[in-house]
A protein has these predicted regions:
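Extended, charged amphipathic alpha-helical segments
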Residues: 72-150, 155
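Residue-level signal for functionally critical sites in structured catalytic/ligand-binding pockets
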Residues: 6-11, 126, 184, 189
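A glycine-rich, acidic short-motif signal
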Residues: 1-104
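Structured, hydrophobic secondary-structure cores that serve as assembly/anchoring elements
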Residues: 132, 136-199
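Helix N-cap and loop-to-helix transition residues
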Residues: 21, 116, 181-184
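Generic structural signal for short, flexible, solvent-exposed coil/loop and linker residues
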Residues: 2, 31, 57-60, 130, ...
Length: 199
């Protein structure tokens, strides 16, 4: 069923990870990684009375196609951080920096980085984004990288190029029904170079 849903052409999935759902999140992340297309946002809630623990992410820390967001569960009861951040992010030009997402209406920022450096280090170790004040003035997402450390913008841009090239080559082949010969190969190379030149 997941493959059928995945094949419907989505670009992003947001999955809220509740306590006990970690195995599902890991499996979903590995699935998206294997497809090498699309982007998974995991939204993890944490217990405000305990130190954050993202150790379950160790199994998928090399996954490039998974972005993790997290807020204290008392501040994010409806898993709105990932959804709001993603909604704001996709309005921006392809390849924009995920860090500079701010003014998320339904998300309550951390109060002026009320966690210390050691607390923030737990987030940064796994490139987990939270919502906090930057320089005590502007609320922003604290991290714009996937689990493996690759920029979210780069991964989205990679998918954009892949989709555009695939669509244009497919259109050429369907509309022209060219024979398989050197001229057709050169035409396909020109299509690909055209997409890359205008990227």
């Amino acid at each position: 069923r997941l493959l059928k849903y995945y094949g419907a052409g989505f670009e992003y999935i947001v999955y809220p990870v509740a306590s006990g759902d970690e195995d599902v999140a890991v499996a979903l992340s590995n699935f998206v990684e294997e497809q090498d297309m699309g982007y998974l946002f995991l939204n993890i809630t944490t217990d405000p009375t305990k130190p954050v623990d993202f150790s379950t992410l160790d199994q998928i820390k090399d996954n490039r196609s998974t972005k993790v967001t997290s807020l204290n569960s008392t501040l994010d009861p409806n898993f709105v951080l990932a959804s709001n951040a993603l909604g704001k992010y996709v309005e921006q030009p392809i390849g924009s920096n995920f860090n500079f997402i701010d003014q998320l209406g339904e998300v309550q920022p951390q109060d002026r980085y009320e966690f210390g450096y050691d607390d923030l280090a737990a987030y940064e170790k796994y490139n987990v984004a939270t919502y906090a004040y930057e320089n005590n003035t502007t609320p922003m997402i604290t991290n714009g990288r996937s689990l493996s450390g690759v920029s979210t913008g780069i991964m989205v841009y990679k998918d954009y190029l892949t989709r555009t090239i695939t669509n244009r080559v497919t259109d050429y082949l369907v509309q022209n029904k060219p024979p398989y010969n050197a001229a057709t190969v050169k035409a396909i190379i020109s299509i690909i170079q055209g997409v890359l030149a205008n990227a």
